[in-house]
Curated annotation (Swiss-Prot):
Alphabetized Gene3D superfamilies for the sequence: 3.30.70.860, YajQ-like, domain 2
Keywords: Nucleotide-binding
UniProt similarity note: Belongs to the YajQ family.
CDD domains linked: YajQ_like
Described function: Nucleotide-binding protein.
Protein name: Nucleotide-binding protein CHY_1197
Disulfide bond sites: none
One of the record's GO molecular function terms: nucleotide binding
Signal peptide range in chain numbering: none
Annotated InterPro entries: DUF520, UPF0234-like_C, UPF0234_N, YajQ-like_sf
Pfam family, any one: DUF520
One Gene Ontology CC term in the entry: cytosol
PANTHER family with a match to the protein in the record: UPF0234 PROTEIN YAJQ
Length: 165
């Protein structure tokens, strides 16, 4: 039996689900009456982890964002992963907006999570590994208590627990 148990805390967006949501949003926009005759584009750049939306005017852009958000929620992708850029004028009298997909746990948030875990006085160790955290301890019960605590507290991130050992 292992002497130490551990798990990782990550915050990663599910890119295939985002891609599906973008495709569904494009399909709905092409069929909706209020978008008839307008030019609305939604592009997912998986490498840069961003979504670019281009529309004829600001109103249609906001409606396209609403449709995309609805499709993301339906595909169980949290809107906390989205970081909205400013609406900017684009070529040909159109407007565009870039939405970045946040991935990973920033250092400040990681330190905040570690402080929260330390305040519980549970016998667990927490390490920062790049953009994730590893929590290890001798008892599974302590690790389960940490997971329960982190699920109850709001950090402004979507936390996922993986790599149980």
């Amino acid at each position: 039996m292992a002497s130490d148990y551990s798990f990782d805390i990550v915050s990663e967006v599910n890119l295939p689900e985002v891609k599906n949501a973008v495709n569904q949003a494009l399909k709905e926009i092409s069929q909706r009456y209020d978008f008839k005759g307008s030019n609305v584009e939604i592009e997912l750049n998986e490498k840069e982890k961003e979504i670019r939306i281009t529309a004829d005017d600001e109103y249609r852009l906001k409606r396209a964002v609403d449709v995309l958000e609805a499709k993301l929620v339906k595909r169980q992708v949290s809107l906390k992963f989205l970081d909205y850029g400013k609406i900017e004028p684009a070529l040909g009298g159109t407007v565009k907006q870039t939405i970045k997909l946040k991935s990973g746990i920033p250092r400040e948030k990681a330190k905040e999570i570690i402080d929260t875990i330390k305040q519980t006085k549970l016998k667990v160790q927490t390490q920062i590994l790049d953009d994730k955290l590893r929590v290890s301890g001798k008892k599974k019960d302590d690790l389960q208590a940490v997971i329960k605590l982190l699920k109850e507290k709001e950090f402004g991130l979507v936390l996922q627990f993986t790599n149980y050992r």
